[in-house]
Amino acid sequence: MKNDTSRFSIRRAEPGDYQAFASTFAGERAYSGTLQMPFPSQDSWRKRLAEPDPNSVVLVVEAEGEVIANAGLHPAQPVDIRRRRHAMTLGITVRDDWQGKGAGTKLMSALVDLADNWFGALRLELTVYTDNAAAIALYRKFGFTVEGTHRAYALRDGRLVDTYAMARLHPHPPSRAPANDTEPKVAAT
């Protein structure tokens, strides 16, 4: 059955969302699927949200009056390399009790729209654990493909685990809008 994403609303993250971020990343499935550590600090999230990167966008999904998911769209690192200006990275996290209900799809749709139509990004990149089948399926749904495997990429629960490097190229890179063929009429003086 297809998930109904109309019950979700998306907005920019705000400094007051720090408790929801800490709560989301406290979920075992959430932190084990990211590079976050267990027992997240509310204070560290408060600081990060109070001083956001001006070149990034951090979004949240709300449902039933609560923040249940978050995602970020960031310039590819290192940001001072001009030859990588066309690329952006993204990350997404859904609270454990909301996974598989469409919040990730809603966020991915918003991130891809922002990247394609507002940032003019030609390439989106992400890293995902090779055993995170649900996330991989979500990314594939939005046109991401596996470009390679990072072996022993991160320590998770006492084991070194692999990740996939996934990317998506803009399917229809921006072009110039058609020119207006008529000259503007200027009043004679």
What positions do the PLM features span?
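Central antiparallel beta-sheet cores of small beta-barrel/beta-sandwich binding domains
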Residues: 67-71, 126, 131
